[in-house]
Amino acid sequence: MERVDELELLMEKSFWQEAEPSAELFQKKKVEASFSKIVLSRGMDNRYLVLAVDIVQSEEGNHEKHLIITASQSLEYKELCILRNDWCSVPVEPGDIIHLEGDCISNTWIIDEDFGYLILYPDMLISGTSIASSIRCMRRAVLSETFRSSDPATRQMLIGTVLHEVFQKAVSDSFAPEKLQELASQTIQEIRHLKEMYRLKLNQDEIKQEVEEYLPSFSKWAGDFMHKHTSTDFPQMQLSLPSDGSNSNSTCNIEVTNSLDIEESIWSPRFGLKGKIDVTVGVKIHRGCKTKYKIMPLELKTGKESNSIEHRSQLVLYTLLSQERRADPEAGLLLYLKTGQMYPVPAKHLDKRELLRLRNQMAFSLFHRINKSTGEKTELAPLPQIIEEQQTCKYCSQMGNCALYSRAVEQQMEDSSVPTSMWPKIKEETQHLKPIHLEYFSLWCLMLTLESQSKDNKRNYQHIWLMPASEMEESGSCIGSLIRIEHVKTVCDGQYLHNFQRKNGAIPITNLMAGDRIILSGEERTLFALSRGYVKEINSTTVTCSLDRNLSGLPESTLFRLDQEEKNCDIDTPLGNLSKLMENTRASQKLRDLIIDFREPQFISYLSSVLPHEAKDTVACILKGLNKPQRQAMKKVLLSKDYTLIVGMPGTGKTTTICTLVRILYACGFSVLLTSYTHSAVDNILLKLAKFKIGFLRLGQIQKVHPDIQKFTEEEICRSKSIKSLALLEELYNSQLIVATTCMGINHPIFSRKTFDFCIVDEASQISQPVCLGPLFFSRRFVLVGDHQQLPPLVLNREARALGMSESLFKRLEQNKNAVVQLTVQYRMNSKIMSLSNKLTYEGKLECGSDKVANAVINLPNFKDVKLELEFYADYSENPWLIAAFEPNNPVCFLNTHKVPAPEQVEKGGVSNIMEAKLVVFLTSVFIKAGCKPSDIGIIAPYRQQLKVISDLLAQSSVGMVEVNTVDRYQGRDKSIVVVSFVRSNEDGTLGELLKDWRRLNVAITRAKHKLILLGCVPSLSRYPPLRKLLNHLNSEKLIIDLPSGEHESLFHLLGDFQRK
């Protein structure tokens, strides 16, 4: 699913949810934003709600923080948690969720420096790497979590990744020198590493040579720590484990016996941590005549042998993660691959305590990214304090964002404080930016953060551990009780094909479909998030998934669950684009000038100066097939120096126009980056383009690409041509003038070295500004294609919407009229249907492409026979509403249900109208009996509950497969007949949000080619301004027909009689 109607669901919820008593607000103020229900529990996985926080003074005169907490859903049974020593500094507040480790005696927990831990927001899982990096600078760690794409790839990172993989393969195979050479060669030839070499402009042979320098150390390490004859042959080390007791000798010999797992992914909702352990190894600790066996994390480092606090801290955190799967390892092993030197790292209580306190500080900063006080405006919260370590800042990858956030956000606050020594650096990093640029950054940063924190938009996965699969299955986003069948097939390194079946019975009804991203977990609590991947194939008995880990090592009896990986609001990419827009580069400066400063776009005067002589005949031939507005669009784009906006009104052949534009640009020798928000929109253009034998490169995950386009994907080309060298990959990237991807695919390495002559963005009016920005950095000129009179960008958060987040870049730039070309000749609607949109939205600009289009009516070959039946059952010729609805020569009618009556029903599930639903089914069944194909009929309703009611009634009737969907799903598509059920009908004047949106109404009334039937209660719908305007027009044209008054049961009887016939 690419673009779903979450906005509609959100608006529906806002209508039928009751207001909560203010007394309960404090309990839910943050919890509700994280999860729809407060899930509390005792025991090992306890989750407590904090009800009150007090600072008290102990008898010894020390300050303590006393928390009144409860694990009771009814909030009746309360307990006390006493925080002592440094735990007092944990920024815990009423309404927070916490997890406690320790002992509870007489309903009292005591957490102090010697015993116990408190985990704040345990459902927020933070990586061990992030926490370790926060030791030197908490601000950098928080920025890296926020602006993820700003941490650039480096040569050393690539070499580190390759070395990790070689070591990990060797530990499961052999450390023989010739084997290591073979593994290194194979690993360097893998496409993902070649792509990084391309990004970083590296030489493949040089990288191979540098990797090979490490290999002797690999063999040395294996010789030292594996496969010796006696325990004394292993190196001596100093390691004391708590379980050995305080009197134990710390000297021991360490033997690594075997590798149990590679890149073991562990999520720990107990400690609020997540991470991937490089290698999980079995270790024998020989101490005198005693031997102890432990399973430990082995962390690999490729940089300088520092045994630094960050490196050691990572291992300490991995010991906590390991406890989710097995006994406490009490220590970990730190191996520097350059030298083969290995250090044991004990996990002492003090270290774990301080690291978990750091984790809590970081969680607090990430959770409280918004400051919102009652009656005050919402604003971004300040980040952790800027440190005064210029050497650390000098090499910090987040320095630009640090300074930018300080200038744009924090320095606008009254209590802003920046260390004096850092002022010159902040000024240097941001001096190229005007105040208006900083305001743009601050506003969009706020709106994106608000959107990401919407209840229906949180990118949290706590349902995996908080809700059983059986419950989640009801939502359609999960399948539980799965067992693995057949052998795991290795597609390539990092892709493993797994087949699953339900342990008992068939696969339940689900929303999961091929191409959907998923997270695979075990049903038991120790096996959260074992692997990530996507659904390859799904049917009633089997689910086939491509996963990033081979799970064949788990017992055959293991029960699994699949959870859909929702990415409704992936703000990493738009925040990265926003940050990039503020950079001091030529491309960013140009976009700031055009987008923020509204510099007038420039145009060339004569086509002859841009049209190559050899391309003139080809271009002229292509132009012959276009109408006048389309030809004007081609000319405007060719003459542009900056950008062009093409307004694609309904039915005007937007996709054909884009395809033609690409053909012309290709003929002129221009390079083109073709993008859109959805994969389907990109592929719709490519499907047309492929017919003209024009080559292109399609980027993106192959499972998301249309089957007929997959042969043009990078993945398929690399596979079919067996590309294993950087030279061949470069040749592929340089061979195609046209590259296509979605707006979210702009982190691909090709964009690090390629600038296109033109970037074309389809669906531009539906894409939020920071997302749309992404591809524009990589082109000299851009073309936005859309129509802001149709669906806007999807924004779930009301506050973000009110601040202006639904303004697309297309809408923002449309004020420069000289850059706008309108496509006004449409080939979809007949003249009567078109007139509605002309009156409502387009001020008479739309025109039919031909008389044939203007006069087209629905073809119903069996209509005469059906008319006779209707005459018999319903006195057809005496019923104006039946004539209006079914006569082919009446293309438009509004059936007013006010007198029927047809009241709405408001339930927890949403808003529906059973009478309208039955009318829709009746109308549909008549049209099908009259000879219309089910696939030529579209049913639209604004509320999901109504869609469900209509779908259920259709399933019970003899009607075939008719598409029932929301307006959002019909954007860009059409049907011969469209029936719209408006649902709302009440006496109390209640208004919902959905029908207030004139753009949705415009889309709804422009989907039909030959017949448009609107159903609703005129008095109720007249309260909505957009509908009032439409109804006034329909009334003036005498197109509103009142359904007969009287007992509505008799009408139901009539409909039933006809359907049974």
UniProtKB/Swiss-Prot annotation:
The keyword Nuclease applies. Residues 520-1061 are annotated as: Helicase activity. It catalyses: ATP + H2O = ADP + phosphate + H(+). [4Fe-4S] cluster binds at residues 137, 393, 396, 402. It is found in: Nucleus; Mitochondrion. It is an enzyme of class 3 (hydrolase). GO terms for cellular component: cytoplasm; mitochondrion; nucleus. Acetylated by EP300, leading to stimulate the 5'-3' endonuclease, the 5'-3' helicase and DNA-dependent ATPase activities, possibly by increasing DNA substrate affinity. Its main location: nucleus. One of its GO terms (biological process) is DNA replication checkpoint signaling. Residues 82-519 are annotated as: Nuclease activity. CDD domains: DEXXQc_DNA2 (cd18041), DNA2_N-like (cd22318), SF1_C_Upf1 (cd18808). GO terms for molecular function: 4 iron, 4 sulfur cluster binding; 5'-3' DNA helicase activity; 5'-flap endonuclease activity; ATP binding; ATP hydrolysis activity; DNA binding; metal ion binding; nuclease activity. Pfam families: AAA_11, AAA_12, Dna2, Dna2_Rift. Its EC number is 3.1.-.-, 3.6.4.12. Binds 1 [4Fe-4S] cluster. The keyword Mitochondrion applies. Interacts with BLM and WDHD1. Belongs to the DNA2/NAM7 helicase family. Key enzyme involved in DNA replication and DNA repair in nucleus and mitochondrion. Involved in Okazaki fragments processing by cleaving long flaps that escape FEN1: flaps that are longer than 27 nucleotides are coated by replication protein A complex (RPA), leading to recruit DNA2 which cleaves the flap until it is too short to bind RPA and becomes a substrate for FEN1. Also involved in 5'-end resection of DNA during double-strand break (DSB) repair: recruited by BLM and mediates the cleavage of 5'-ssDNA, while the 3'-ssDNA cleavage is prevented by the presence of RPA. This is DNA replication ATP-dependent helicase/nuclease DNA2.
